C-alpha cells in the first residue's frame, strides 16, 4: 500500500516536471526570434496602421529602423551598445519523442499564419480580376492605376497580377495629390476604347483621378470600409461613372487564421427618384474562386426604367420648322407661349418613353442667333438639353455633346422664278434649240445638192444672191407644199433621177419632222411648261446674282474656308442681313440685278408655304428654293459635356427612326402648321375626295394660241421693217442723185453767171430770144417789186414775150431794176399761149398751197410736179399718167422730161447779144447786174419764151435745155 502511494507520488512529480520541461521546450522565446531572423527580419510584425478608416496589417520597414537608429541619443545608443548580445541556444537534441512532436513546416505555418492568409487573399483577388478581364474588358485595352500606398504595402499583389495578366495593358501611378504622373494615358489615340482597373486607398477620389466615364468599364478596388463604399455609390461623384464595378473585402469579426475572406461586388442604380439620386446595389460575392450568384452581369445596363420623373431644363429658341414659338393671350391679357415643331413633338414622345419631365426656357443672348445662343448656355451648364434646329458642326461637337441626327437639313438658295413659261413660247416647245438649228441648216443646205443635181454646176449660184433666194423658196415651197412652182427651171419639172431622189428624201424628212412637231404641240399648248430654275451653284454662278445670308448663327463663317472654286468665286462678295425676313424681302424687291439668299432649306420652305404662299397666287413669279443642297447638315439636340442622359436619348432617337415615327411627326408638323395658297390651314380629306380627278376636256383659248398670232405679227413687223429699209434706201439714193445734180447745176450756173456778167458789161442789154409766131405782139403784164404792173415788151423783132421770174434774193423797194420794162413798152399780142406759162400757174395756186410750198414738205409731198400746165404731187402725177395711158404711152419720167423740155426752151437760135454761139441753146440767160458794184445778194433772172407752135413742131436746130427750177425755199418744183 505504501509502495503504491510512493509510486504515485513519484509519477506525479515526474509528470509535473516533464510537462514543465516540455512546455518550455515547445514554446521557447528565442526560438521564435530565430525563425524571424531566418526570414531576414529583426522583429515581429505585430503592429497595425490606420489608413482610410480601415485597419490592416502593416509591414516592417528596415529603412525606418535604420533612420531611428541613426537619430538615437548618445545615452540610448550607449545603453544599447552596453546591453548584452543575444545568445543563440542550440537546439537540444533529444532522441526521445515526448507526446506528439511537430515538424518544422508545421511550426513555420503556425508562426507565419498571417503571411499565408494575406497570400491567399491576394491570389483570390488576382483570380477574380483575371476572370473579369477575360469576360468584360478584353475588347478594350485596360489601364491599371495604383496609388503610392498600394505600391508600398501590396507590392506582392501587384507583382502577382502583372505576372499573370491575360491581355495587353497599360500601367499608371497615382501621385500623392491623386493626379496621374502621366495624364496622357487617359486620352486614347485612335478608335480604340479604354477600360480602367484602379487600386485606390480613398474611394471618394475616384472621379478626381479618371473624371466622368460614360462608356468605359471601370473596376475599382479601394482600401476603404464597406460603409465608405456605399456612401460613394450613393453620392453625386459616382453619377457620371456609369459602368462602375466596386470590389470590396468583407471584414468579419471571428477571423480564423486559415480562412479566406470573401470579396463583395457592388454597383449603383442611377436616377431612382425625381431628384436624380443613386442607390448602391450588391451584385454578388467572390469566395473560393467562384461567385456566390452565378450568371450575374457585373456591368448591368443602367437607366432601363428611364429617369423616374426627373425634371430637365431645356433651352429652346424659335427655329422653324424644328422649334416654332407661338404667342397667344387669354381673356385677361396674359401672354401664353406655346411651342410647336418637330423637335418639340420629339421631346414629348421621348419624355413619355424615358419617364422624365422638362421645363422650357429661352436663352438670353438672342443676338447670337437661335443655334449659337442655345449652344452657349448649354456649354456653360445652364441647361440639360438644347433644342433649336441646331446643325452638327465640329466646333459645336468640341464644345458640347450632341445627339445623333434626328433630321437632315441643308443650306439652299432662295431665288425669284417664273411660275410657268408664257404660252406664246409653246410653238417652240416641241423642239429644243439644237433641233431648230439643225432643221434650218438642213433646209438651207438643201439648195446646193438640189441645184447641183439639176444643173450639174453651181456657177449660176455663185455671187448671185437673188438666185440663191429663189432656190430657198423653191426648197421651202416644195417640201411644205405651201407654194407651187411650175416654171421652166423648177425642180418639180426635172427629169433627172438624182434630183427626184433628193426631193423624195427631203420630202420624207419633212413629213417626219412635221409629224413629230404636230404630235407634241398640243401638249405644250394645253399644259404649262415650267421654266428653268436655279437648283445648283453652277446655274447661280452663270447668272448675275447678288448673294446674301445671315450675319449670325454661324452662317457668316461656315463658307469662308471652302475649297470649292465656284463657291469661293460666288461668295467672294457675300452680303449679310440681320433676319430671314429681310433676306426674303431683298429677293422679292430686287431691281435690275437678281438677288439670291442662302439659308436653311427647311426654314425657307416653311416660311414660303405658311406665310407667303397666298401672296404669289395667280402671279407669274414666285419664290423658289433650290432642290440641290449647297451644304448638308445634320440636326441634333445639344447636351452638356459628359451628360448621363445622352446615351438613353440617342437610343430612343434611333428606335424612333427605325420605326418611322420621326417621318410621321415631320408630316404632322407640315400638315398642321403650313397653309394652303388661300391662306387657310390644310384640312384632312377622306373617302372619294382623296382620289385624283381626271382633267376635263376644254377648248383652246386665245391665250393658248397667242403664239401663232404673235408669230404672224412678227412676220408682219419684219416685213414692214424691210419695207421701211428699202424705202429709206431708195430715198437715200434719190437724195444723193439730187445733191449731185444740184452741185452740177450750181457749177454750171456759176459759169453762166460769169459769162453773162462779161456779156452785160460789154453790151449793157439783155439777150433777146428768138421770135415765135405765138407770142408775137402779145404783151404780158407783171407786177414789179414796187407793186406796179409792168408789161414785158417783145424783142427787137417783136417775136417773143420776155418774162422774168426772180428766184433768189430779195430786191429792196427803192432799188431800181434795170431789167424792168416800162409799161408803154409792151406790145399787144394777137394770140394767147396754148399752154400756161409757169408764172401764170403760180399765180393761180392758192395761198395755202404757196405757204406749203414755201415751208417745205412737212405734211404733204416732197416733190411737186408741173404736168399739163398744173402743179401736183408726184403721186397725183402717177395716178394721172395711169389714167391717161392712151395719151401717154411712156413712163412718168419721160412725160415729165417732155413737159419740161417744152417749157424751158429758148426761142432764139442764136442771140446777137450773146458772148458765145452756144449760149443760145441754154435753158435761160443768166445775167449779173452791177458789174462794178459789190453785191450782197445774187439775183438770177430766167427768161421764159412760151412758144405758140404745136407740141412737136420744133426746129431741128432748136436746143432743148432741161433745168430744175428751185426757189429760195429749196423746193424741187420740176425734175
UniProtKB/Swiss-Prot annotation:
Membrane spanning stretches: 433-453, 505-525, 708-728
Span list, region Disordered: 757-839, 911-938
Domain of life the protein comes from: Eukaryota
The UniProt record lists the keyword Cell membrane: yes
Membrane topology term: Multi-pass membrane protein
One GO CC term on file: plasma membrane
Expression tissues: In both female and male antenna, expressed specifically in 3 sensory neurons of flagellomere 13 segment (at protein level).
An example Gene Ontology biological process: detection of temperature stimulus involved in sensory perception
InterPro entries: Glu/Gly-bd, Insect_Ionotropic_Sensory_Rcpt, Iontro_rcpt_C
UniProt-annotated glycosylation sites, renumbered to this chain: 67, 177, 355, 464, 561, 586, 611, 763, 797
Keyword Transmembrane helix: yes
One Pfam family it belongs to: Lig_chan
Family: Belongs to the glutamate-gated ion channel (TC 1.A.10.1) family.
Database matches in PANTHER family: IONOTROPIC RECEPTOR 20A-RELATED (PTHR42643), IONOTROPIC RECEPTOR 60A (PTHR42643:SF24)
Its biological purpose: Integral part of a neural sensory system in the antenna that provides the neural basis for the response to environmental changes in temperature (thermosensation). Specifically, required for thermosensing by the cooling cell. Plays a role in heat seeking and heat-stimulated blood feeding behavior.
The name this protein goes by in its record: Ionotropic receptor 21a
Gene: Ir21a
Amino acid at each position: 500500500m505504501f509502495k503504491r502511494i510512493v509510486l504515485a507520488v513519484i509519477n506525479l512529480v515526474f509528470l509535473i516536471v516533464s510537462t514543465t520541461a516540455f512546455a518550455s521546450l515547445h514554446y521557447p522565446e528565442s526560438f521564435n526570434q530565430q525563425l524571424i531572423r531566418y526570414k531576414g527580419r529583426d522583429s515581429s510584425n505585430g503592429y497595425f496602421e490606420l489608413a482610410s478608416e480601415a485597419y490592416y496589417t502593416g509591414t516592417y520597414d528596415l529603412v525606418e529602423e535604420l533612420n531611428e537608429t541613426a537619430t538615437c541619443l548618445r545615452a540610448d545608443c550607449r545603453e544599447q551598445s552596453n546591453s548584452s548580445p543575444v545568445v543563440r541556444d542550440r537546439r537540444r537534441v533529444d532522441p526521445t519523442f515526448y507526446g506528439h512532436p511537430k515538424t518544422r513546416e508545421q511550426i513555420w505555418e503556425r508562426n507565419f499564419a498571417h503571411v499565408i492568409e494575406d497570400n491567399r487573399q491576394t491570389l483570390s483577388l488576382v483570380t477574380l480580376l483575371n476572370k473579369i478581364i477575360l469576360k468584360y474588358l478584353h475588347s478594350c485595352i485596360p489601364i491599371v492605376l495604383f496609388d503610392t500606398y498600394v505600391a508600398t504595402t501590396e507590392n506582392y499583389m501587384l507583382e502577382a497580377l502583372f505576372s499573370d495578366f491575360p491581355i495587353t495593358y497599360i500601367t499608371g501611378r497615382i501621385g500623392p495629390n491623386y493626379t496621374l504622373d502621366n495624364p496622357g494615358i487617359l486620352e486614347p489615340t485612335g478608335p480604340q476604347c479604354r477600360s480602367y482597373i484602379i487600386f485606390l486607398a480613398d474611394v471618394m477620389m475616384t472621379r478626381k483621378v479618371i473624371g466622368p466615364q460614360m462608356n468605359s468599364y471601370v473596376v475599382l478596388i479601394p482600401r476603404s470600409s464597406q460603409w465608405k463604399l456605399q456612401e460613394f455609390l450613393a453620392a453625386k461623384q459616382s453619377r457620371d461613372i456609369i459602368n462602375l464595378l466596386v470590389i470590396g473585402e468583407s471584414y468579419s469579426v471571428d477571423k480564423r487564421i486559415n480562412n479566406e475572406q470573401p470579396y463583395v461586388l457592388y454597383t449603383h442604380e442611377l436616377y431612382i427618384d425625381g431628384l436624380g439620386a443613386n442607390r448602391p446595389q450588391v451584385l454578388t460575392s467572390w469566395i473560393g474562386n467562384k461567385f456566390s450568384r452565378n450568371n450575374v452581369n457585373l456591368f448591368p445596363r443602367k437607366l432601363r426604367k428611364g429617369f423616374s420623373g426627373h425634371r430637365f431644363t431645356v433651352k429652346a429658341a424659335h427655329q422653324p420648322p424644328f422649334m416654332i414659338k407661338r404667342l397667344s393671350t387669354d381673356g385677361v391679357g396674359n401672354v401664353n407661349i406655346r411651342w410647336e415643331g418637330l423637335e418639340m413633338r420629339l421631346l414629348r414622345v421621348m419624355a413619355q418613353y424615358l419617364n422624365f419631365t422638362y421645363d422650357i426656357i429661352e436663352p438670353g443672348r438672342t443676338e447670337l442667333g437661335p443655334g449659337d445662343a442655345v449652344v452657349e448656355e448649354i456649354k456653360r451648364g445652364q441647361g440639360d438639353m438644347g433644342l433649336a434646329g441646331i446643325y452638327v458642326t465640329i466646333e459645336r461637337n468640341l464644345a458640347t455633346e450632341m445627339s445623333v441626327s434626328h433630321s437632315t437639313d441643308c443650306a439652299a438658295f432662295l431665288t425669284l422664278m417664273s411660275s410657268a413659261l408664257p404660252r406664246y413660247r409653246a410653238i417652240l416647245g416641241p423642239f429644243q434649240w439644237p433641233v431648230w438649228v439643225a432643221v434650218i441648216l438642213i433646209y438651207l443646205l438643201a439648195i446646193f445638192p438640189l441645184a447641183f443635181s439639176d444643173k450639174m454646176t453651181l456657177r449660176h449660184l455663185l455671187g448671185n444672191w437673188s438666185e440663191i433666194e429663189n432656190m430657198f423658196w423653191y426648197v421651202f415651197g416644195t417640201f411644205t407644199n405651201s407654194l407651187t412652182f411650175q416654171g421652166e427651171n423648177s425642180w418639180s419639172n426635172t427629169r433627172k433621177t438624182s434630183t427626184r431622189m433628193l426631193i423624195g428624201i427631203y420630202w420624207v424628212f419633212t413629213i417626219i419632222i412635221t409629224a413629230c412637231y404636230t404630235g407634241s404641240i398640243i401638249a405644250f399648248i394645253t399644259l404649262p411648261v415650267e421654266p428653268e430654275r436655279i437648283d445648283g451653284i453652277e446655274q447661280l454662278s452663270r447668272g448675275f446674282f447678288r448673294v446674301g445670308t445671315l450675319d449670325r448663327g454661324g452662317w457668316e463663317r461656315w463658307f469662308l474656308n471652302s475649297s470649292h472654286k465656284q463657291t469661293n468665286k460666288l461668295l467672294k462678295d457675300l452680303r449679310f442681313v440681320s433676319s430671314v425676313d429681310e433676306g426674303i424681302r431683298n429677293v422679292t424687291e430686287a431691281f435690275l440685278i437678281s438677288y439670291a439668299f442662302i439659308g436653311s432649306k427647311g426654314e425657307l420652305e416653311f416660311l414660303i408655304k405658311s406665310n407667303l404662299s397666298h401672296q404669289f397666287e395667280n402671279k407669274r413669279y414666285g419664290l423658289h428654293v433650290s432642290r440641290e443642297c449647297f451644304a448638308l447638315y445634320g440636326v441634333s439636340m445639344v447636351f452638356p459635356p459628359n451628360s448621363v442622359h445622352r446615351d438613353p436619348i440617342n437610343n430612343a432617337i434611333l428606335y424612333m427612326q427605325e420605326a418611322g415615327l420621326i417621318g410621321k411627326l415631320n408630316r404632322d408638323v407640315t400638315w398642321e402648321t403650313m397653309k394652303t395658297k388661300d391662306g387657310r390651314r390644310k384640312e384632312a380629306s377622306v373617302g372619294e375626295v382623296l382620289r385624283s380627278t381626271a382633267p376635263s376636256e376644254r377648248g383652246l383659248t386665245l391665250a393658248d394660241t397667242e403664239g401663232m398670232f404673235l408669230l404672224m405679227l412678227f412676220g408682219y413687223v419684219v416685213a414692214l421693217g424691210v419695207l421701211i429699209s428699202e424705202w429709206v434706201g431708195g430715198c437715200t439714193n434719190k437724195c444723193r442723185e439730187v445733191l449731185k445734180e444740184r452741185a452740177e447745176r450750181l457749177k454750171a450756173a456759176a459759169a453762166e453767171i460769169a459769162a453773162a456778167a462779161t456779156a452785160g458789161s460789154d453790151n449793157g442789154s439783155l439777150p433777146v430770144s428768138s421770135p415765135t409766131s405765138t407770142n408775137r405782139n402779145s404783151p404780158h403784164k407783171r407786177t414789179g417789186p414796187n407793186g406796179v404792173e409792168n408789161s414785158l415788151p417783145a424783142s427787137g423783132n417783136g417775136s417773143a414775150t420776155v418774162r422774168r421770174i426772180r428766184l433768189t434774193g430779195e430786191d429792196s423797194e427803192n432799188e431800181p431794176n434795170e431789167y424792168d420794162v416800162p409799161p408803154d413798152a409792151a406790145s399787144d399780142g394777137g394770140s394767147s399761149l396754148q399752154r400756161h406759162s409757169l408764172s401764170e400757174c403760180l399765180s393761180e395756186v392758192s395761198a395755202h398751197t404757196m405757204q406749203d410750198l414755201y415751208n417745205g414738205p412737212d405734211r404733204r409731198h416732197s416733190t411737186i410736179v408741173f404736168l399739163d400746165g398744173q402743179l401736183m404731187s408726184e403721186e397725183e402725177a402717177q395716178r394721172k399718167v395711169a389714167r391717161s395711158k392712151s395719151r401717154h404711152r411712156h413712163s412718168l419720167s419721160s412725160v415729165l422730161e417732155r413737159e419740161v423740155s417744152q417749157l424751158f426752151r429758148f426761142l432764139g437760135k442764136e442771140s446777137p447779144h450773146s458772148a458765145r454761139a452756144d449760149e443760145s441753146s441754154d435753158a435761160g440767160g443768166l445775167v449779173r447786174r452791177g458789174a462794178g458794184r459789190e453785191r450782197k445778194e445774187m439775183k438770177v433772172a430766167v427768161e421764159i419764151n412760151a412758144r405758140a407752135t404745136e407740141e412737136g413742131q420744133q426746129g431741128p436746130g432748136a436746143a432743148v435745155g432741161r433745168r430744175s427750177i428751185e426757189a429760195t425755199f429749196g423746193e424741187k418744183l420740176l425734175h
